[in-house]
Amino acid sequence: MDEMFDKLQAVADRYDELNELISDPEVIADTQRFMALSKEEGELRETVDKYHQYQDVTQQIADDDEMLHDKLDADMESMIKDELKELTAQKAALEEDIKVLLLPKDPNDDKNIIMEIHGAAGGDEASLFAADLFSMYSKYAERQGWQIEVVDENATEVGGFKEIVMMITGNKVYSKLKYENGAHRVQRVPVTESAGRVHTSTATVGVMPEEEDVDIDIDPKDIRTDVYRSSGAGGQHINKTSSAVRMTHLPTGIVVAMQDERSQQQNRAKAMQILRARVYDYYKQQEESAYNAERKSAVGTGDRSERIRTYNYPQNRVTDHRIGLTLNKLDRIMNGELDDIIDALIVSDQAAKLEDLKNNG
């Protein structure tokens, strides 16, 4: 506990220093520095507020304890004891909140994301489920006030997607959607099933932080770029020049094709953006594989082959297998009401990290 309070005091001291700095006219004149310091101050504010609440509650407990040593009438003594019970519970709750706030932050949590959804096992039904997941995440993003841009899609004749890639931008997108990595299983009666039998299909979801200024060096010699003519349906803008771009990262074999933009330069920029994210994600998965072999985190490894969730339509049920959470409101979840699942995953992840901290110091 002493170590925790040393950390808290250091955070509080830094917070006070930041408040002085962002009031300094010289700092205010330097827009970039002012914004960086304001962001840091905002990130520390909740922790410092909780620390001050903790100090206040601790002082109130000490004052009440001292009063109990005085001669009191029965009613006053009973009232103080009741207050002490309440304050002790508040103190314990604040300690837990502070422990969570002091956990190491995921450096990617504030980032935007690139999300890929692939129809996997199940043919047409899997592609339709991929479209349903796209709709679910789009509605969730709308509820969060985030923006979605589809950057690539491979539609099927039945109205589904073999693959759809989108960028989601907004406040702390990765912190909430990083838990969606994995295989999503659906159990339902396909519209084409005349006998009414329930079929099982899967779609995979990949979530990667957008890496514009990523700490990863991609040697231009490691990228092969091919250009070709865009294809499009009748009535769409079709380039007569070679504006479509296919980039291959030779060391990993990762391929990105882009033809949605109107110029080769725009397609190159968008393809490079997605390639950087995929290459970063590839190496991140490689680094984490050894750790995950020793200890699977509460929310899974993030491996896209890992089945993380089942959506059972006949029973209106969604089960997240990583934390054993079952919710009987599939209709609302598919309408973008994901908060109950995501909040539970965050709490479970934090609990696992606290346990790790306790066991490994």
Swiss-Prot record:
Matching Pfam families: PCRF, RF-1
SMART domains: PCRF (SM00937)
Modified how: Methylated by PrmC. Methylation increases the termination efficiency of RF1.
Lineage top rank: taxon: Bacteria
GO MF term set: translation release factor activity, codon specific
Keywords assigned by UniProt, alphabetized: Cytoplasm, Methylation, Protein biosynthesis
Gene Ontology terms: cellular component: cytoplasm
Gene3D superfamilies attached to this UniProt entry: 3.30.160.20, 3.30.70.1660, 6.10.140.1950
HAMAP family: Rel_fac_1
Function according to Swiss-Prot or TrEMBL: Peptide chain release factor 1 directs the termination of translation in response to the peptide chain termination codons UAG and UAA.
Family: Belongs to the prokaryotic/mitochondrial release factor family.
Name of the featured protein: Peptide chain release factor 1
Organism phylogeny: Bacteria, Bacillati, Bacillota, Bacilli, Lactobacillales
